[in-house]
A protein has these predicted regions:
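Short aromatic-glycine-enriched beta-strand elements
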Residues: 51-62
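Short boundary/loop segments of OB/S1/cold-shock single-stranded nucleic-acid-binding domains
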Residues: 24-39
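Bacterial N-terminal signal peptides
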Residues: 8-22
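Short, basic/aromatic beta-hairpin or loop at an interaction surface
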Residues: 67-79
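Short nucleic-acid-contacting surface segments enriched for D/E, G, S/T with interspersed K/R
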Residues: 83-100
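Conserved hydrophobic positions within beta-strands
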Residues: 41-45
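OB-fold/S1-family single-stranded nucleic acid-binding modules
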Residues: 105-134
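N-terminal secretory signal peptides that target proteins for export/translocation
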Residues: 1-5
Length: 140
């Protein structure tokens, strides 16, 4: 009986160890996103996915040559956004003009992660709808 219990415990420990790596890799923020140099981009919302575990904003913005580029910005989950900023599924709608400040993917792709320090404002009114810069201005 003791041997069977010990074997079960060892099997559980091995399985937990095996899934820990992918879990940490999934949430490996610093390796992929440039926190030291917040990026500012202004664009037009195409889609807002207010879901768990991660919400997302799909938007278009002009690149340096003036061509429209599709962007993806990942946020925290719907529950966290609602608690922190009172967001709902209607907070952003297709056609809304937004300004985003936050970490861009280090590989230069049009991908941002806004689940840490970031700011989102409505471009037309300047109204800030999200700010997680912890009482400091971007880049400080």
């Amino acid at each position: 009986m003791k041997c069977r219990l010990a074997s079960s415990f060892c099997a559980l420990a091995v399985n937990l160890f095996l899934i820990a790596g992918p879990a940490f890799a999934h949430h490996g923020f610093a390796g992929r996103y440039d926190e030291e140099h917040p990026y500012t981009v202004q664009g037009t919302v195409l889609e807002f996915q207010f879901i768990n575990p991660h919400s997302a904003i799909i938007f278009e913005a002009k690149d340096q040559s003036g061509a429209m580029q599709r962007w993806h910005a990942e946020l925290g989950g719907a529950n966290a956004l609602h608690r922190a900023d009172n967001w709902t599924k209607d907070t952003l709608k297709p056609g809304d003009k937004i300004t985003i400040v936050g970490p861009r993917n280090k590989n230069g792709s049009n991908d941002m992660n806004l689940s840490h320090e970031s700011k989102i404002s409505m471009a037309d009114s300047g109204k800030e709808i999200h700010n997680s810069f912890r009482n400091q201005q971007p880049g400080q």
